[in-house]
Amino acid sequence: MSAAAASSAAGDSAKQPLLHHQRGNPPHVASVSSPSLPSAPPGALAGGRRFPGGLDVPNLKKRGGGTRSWIRVEAATASVQTLEVDKATMMRRCELPARDLRLLDPLFVYPSTILGRERAIVVNLEQIRCVITADEVLLLNSLDSYVLQYAAELQRRLLQRAEGDELPFEFRALELALEAACSFLDAQAAELEIEAYPLLDELTSKISTLNLERVRRLKSRLVALTRRVQKVRDEIEQLMDDDGDMAEMYLSEKKLRTEASFYGDQSMLGYNSVGDGTSFSAPVSPVSSPTESRKLEKAFSLCRSRHDSVKSSDNTATEHIQELEMLLEAYFVVIDSTLNKLTSLKEYIDDTEDFINIQLDNVRNQLIQFELLLTTATFVVAIFGVVAGIFGMNFETSVFSIQNAFQWVLIITGVIGAFIFCGFLWFFKYKRLMPL
C-alpha cells in the first residue's frame, strides 16, 4: 500500500507542472513579437474599443445614455422647474419604451408623431417634444423660443384656468402643443408666400439665371414644408379616425380607475382578513350571523358601486373622446388650411413654370423659323454664285462676244433666285411651318 501511494503521489507531482504549463501562457509564446501587427493604442487596451475611423464607442454610449435637461410643468401647482434626468429614469418614471423616448431625441430626425401610451402621451410636433402625463409635462429643455413660450403659456393657462373649462390636464397640454405646431407651420407658410409671389411675378417678366436659381431654392423649401405639414395633418386625422387611440390618451380617467381599483382591492382584502379572523377565532354562532350578513351586504354594495363607477367612467370617457375629437378637429381645420395655402402656392409655381416653358418654346420656334429663312436664302445665293462662277471660268463661248451679255445673265439668275425663294416661302406657309 505504501509503495502504491508513493507512486501515485509521484505521478500527481509529475502531472501538476504539465497542467500548469497547459493552462498558463507558454513563456516562449509571450516573448515572440510580430513586426507586421501594429501596436494597439492605450485607449483600446484599457478604456474601450476604438474603430479605424476614430469612432469612440464609450463616449457614444455615454452620450446616448447620459442625463438630459427637462423642463417640468406640474399640473396641480403650475410650477415650472428644470430636472436633470437620464434616459433610464425617464423610462421608469413614465413607463415608456426606449423607442418612444428616441422620438424626442434632438440628435435624430423623426417626423411629427403623437403616441398614446398607458401612462403618458409622447408628442413630437416640430420644436415641441414632450411627454405628457396626468400630473405633469416633461419638456426637453432647449434654447428654442417656441419651447420656452410653450412652457410659459402652459403655466399661464394653468394659473388662469376658466371655470367652465372641464378638459383634463393632458388634453390641455396636447392642445397647446398642437396650437404651437400649427402656428409655427402657418407662420412659415405665410413667410414663404410673401417671398414667393413677387419672385414668381418677376420671373414671368424677366427670365434670368438668378431668378431661376431663386425659384429653385424656393421650391425646395416649399416641398420640405409641405411634407412636414402633411405629416402633422395625417397624424391628427389618424387620431380622429381611431377611438381606441383617443381613449388611450385619456390619462386622468385611467389614473382614477387605477386608484379606485386599488382602494377597492384594499377594502376587499380588509374584509377577507376580518372574516378569516372571526372564522378562526370561534365557531359561527347564530348571534354573529347578522354581522356576517351585514358584511356580505357591504361587500355586495362595494362591488355594485365599483361596477357603477366603471360604467360611469366609461360614459365619461366617451364624452371626453368626443371632446378630444372636437379639439383635434379644430386644429385639423387649421393645419388643412395651411396645407391648402402651400398647395395653392405649388400650383402657382407650376403654372409659372408652364408659362416660362411656353415662352421658351416660342423663342425656340422663332429661332428655328429664322434659321429656316436663312438656310433658304443661302440656297438661293448659292445658286446665283454657281451661275456667276460658271461664267467666270476661262472658256470660249459666243455669249462673251455680245455686249452686256454677262449683266443680263446675272439679272436673269437673280430673278430666278427670287422666284425660287418666294416658292419656298409659299411652301412653308402651305405646310404651316412658318406664320407668314
UniProtKB/Swiss-Prot annotation:
Low complexity biased stretches: 1-14, 29-54
Domain of life the protein comes from: Eukaryota
GO terms under cellular component: membrane
Keyword Transport: yes
GO molecular-function terms, A-Z: magnesium ion transmembrane transporter activity
Region forming the signal peptide: none
Family matches, as Gene3D superfamilies: 2.40.128.330, Magnesium transport protein CorA, transmembrane region
CDD domains: Mrs2_Mfm1p-like (cd12823)
Keyword Transmembrane in annotation: yes
Coiled coil (residue ranges): 176-242
Main location: membrane
Transmembrane segments: 372-392, 408-428
Segments carrying motif Required for magnesium transport activity: 392-394
Compartment(s) of residence: Membrane
Protein keywords: Coiled coil, Ion transport, Magnesium, Membrane, Transmembrane, Transmembrane helix, Transport
InterPro entries, alphabetized: CorA_TM1_TM2, MRS2-like
Topology term for the membrane: Multi-pass membrane protein
Pfam family, one: MRS2-like
Ranges for region Disordered: 1-60
Gene Ontology BP terms: magnesium ion transport
Function: Magnesium transporter that may mediate the influx of magnesium.
Family: Belongs to the CorA metal ion transporter (MIT) (TC 1.A.35.5) family.
Protein name from the UniProt record: Magnesium transporter MRS2-B
